[in-house]
């Protein structure tokens, strides 16, 4: 069934489940109750794919970081796919996955907007003011980015960078997941040169 026109989002009340495309802007056009029905292909993939997933997001640097992680894993003999916002849709590789396959998943704020599952390893590089044309404001944008770690458990990992202008340190500290700041320099590398 096709719904068009200014009030096309009103039809969400007629369905139990709505699969949203990342480009559709919802903002505050529908109620919170109706938003609970919304999912996405990203959410479905994260919830139902049993493989290890390394998810990368941030305002800047997602593609570079995702590509580096992919190439490091690939060059070290791992069976790995680079998927997501970088160009290959996640479900395009589903029939190629083996038990040991690792997925490096570049995730935009739009892809994270309606997820209810975090990847096994979540990387949040940074958060700056962007994409505010899509969201009601910076808080809504940050809320989407935070979904990458919101559902982590004690067996998961969060690696994070420049995020504390918009996210409280206490929120990160209270996560049950293993945490590592990019600034921690656990290898004790001399970065002054």
Model-derived regions, located:
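Long, basic/Gly/Ser/Thr-rich N-terminal segments
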Residues: 1-9
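Conserved Class I SAM-dependent methyltransferase catalytic core
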Residues: 161-162
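Short, intrinsically disordered, charge-balanced linker/junction segments flanking boundaries
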Residues: 1, 184-193
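General structural signal for secondary-structure boundaries
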Residues: 8, 40, 191-193
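Phosphate-binding loop of NTP-binding sites
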Residues: 10-17, 22-157, 166-177
């Amino acid at each position: 069934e096709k719904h068009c026109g200014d009030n096309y989002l009103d039809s969400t009340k007629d369905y139990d489940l709505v699969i949203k495309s990342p480009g559709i802007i919802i903002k505050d056009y529908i109620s919170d109750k109706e938003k609970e029905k919304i999912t996405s292909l990203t959410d479905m993939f994260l919830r139902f794919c049993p493989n290890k997933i390394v998810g990368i997001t941030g305002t800047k640097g997602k593609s570079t970081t995702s590509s580096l992680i992919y190439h490091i894993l690939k060059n070290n003999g791992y069976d790995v796919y680079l998927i997501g916002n970088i160009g290959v849709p996640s479900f395009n590789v589903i029939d190629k996955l083996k038990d040991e396959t690792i997925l490096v998943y570049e995730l935009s704020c739009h892809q994270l907007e309606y997820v209810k599952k975090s990847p096994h390893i979540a990387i949040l590089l940074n958060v700056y003011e962007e994409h505010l044309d899509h969201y009601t404001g910076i808080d809504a944008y940050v809320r989407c980015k935070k979904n990458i770690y919101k559902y982590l458990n004690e067996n998961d990992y969060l690696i994070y960078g420049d995020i504390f202008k918009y996210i409280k340190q206490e929120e990160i500290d209270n996560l049950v997941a293993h945490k590592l700041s990019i600034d921690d320099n656990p290898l004790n590398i001399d970065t002054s040169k």
